Regions:
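Terminal targeting signals and extreme-terminal segments of soluble enzymes
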Residues: 1-162
Length: 162
């Protein structure tokens, strides 16, 4: 049975997703990333469509791209959980590759906050490719002592679709 949001129909972006305005630097090269705030917990759900430029020679999404996506997802999860106005540098990021994300697949993750202290934020996610697990990830982010100009991560999820 073919689902409309699979590698068989790469143009489909899931309903409710908005393109995140990450138009500078590293993420401009690796995006676009899509996102929305989860209706139950207000934390980010993010995704991207695997393109050829994301793939290894076997036309499977490169592990480096999956970890880049995980870093963004967990960083935004921690940032939003802390009020949405702080950019959170990564202290530690781990990942276990549990399945492939083939060319054309829709890769998606929903961050989950585990714990927050005064200085650190801990999060995890199971990232899927067309609904099947592909990367289990966890991370520790540093909570900065003050808000940063470029740290309003919550605003990224509230902007109009571009």
């Amino acid at each position: 049975m073919s689902h409309p949001q699979t590698s068989e129909n790469p143009a489909v972006i899931p309903a409710g997703m908005k393109q995140l305005n990450l138009l500078a630097g590293f993420m401009e090269t690796n995006g676009p990333l899509w996102g929305r705030l989860h209706e139950d917990d207000g934390l980010p759900v993010m995704g991207f469509r695997v393109e050829l430029r994301h793939c290894n020679p076997m036309q499977i999404c490169h592990g480096g791209m999956l970890m880049t996506f995980a870093d963004m997802l967990l960083g935004f999860t921690c940032g939003i959980a802390a009020g949405g106005r702080k950019f959170m540098p990564t202290i530690n990021l781990t990942g276990d590759y549990v399945g492939p994300a083939p060319l054309g697949a829709w890769v998606e993750g929903h961050g989950r906050l585990i714990r927050q202290t005064r200085n650190l934020s801990f999060a995890e996610a199971m990232i899927t490719a067309d609904g099947a697990p592909c990367l289990r990830t966890s991370g520790i982010m540093k909570i900065p002592s003050q808000e940063t100009r470029e740290g309003n991560v919550l605003a990224l999820f509230r902007e109009e679709h571009r």
